[in-house]
Amino acid sequence: AIVEICQRIENGHYLDQFPLHVWQTGSGTQTNMNANEVISMLGNEYAKENILHPNDTVNASQSSNDTFPAALHIMVAQKINAELLPQLDLMIHQIKKLEEENEGIIKIGRTHLQDATPLYFSQELSGYRSMIEHSKAQIIDSLKYVYELACGATAVGTGINCPEGFDEVVTKIISEKTHLPFV
């Protein structure tokens, strides 16, 4: 019942059940509990029996302190891999193409508010390309931190009331579903 209702919510159903504003506490407890209560209520209706509880079954082994940072990390990692990195690759490719097309064209360099020494336009473009390539490398390097998910630590980071190995199981499933190396 939980999976069915979550898939329906993911597909845009029941959005009227989520009236909370974006501005709330840092941990997102209001949104997390709202989601747990909605999933529990709708799941019980779907199952035609009262088997789900917002805390004990829907929110089992989780905390807003886990779920919100983990959700943000998942979203950021997906957006970086699916959108940002391909766009940076396209930008690098286009600048490289411009470098080749403008090989041999001389222009005046600028420093502060005055003319400086001459340089090839392709040299100037290669500087822009290099900055983007370095920025891309730094973004890729920083992903190792984004791939770290806060799962199973529960409310204060001790993992109390969370089954042993829960974090590993959850990150493995998330990695399989997203095709990203979460840990």
What function would you assign to each model-found segment?
Residues A1-V183:
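Conserved, well-structured ligand/cofactor-binding cores
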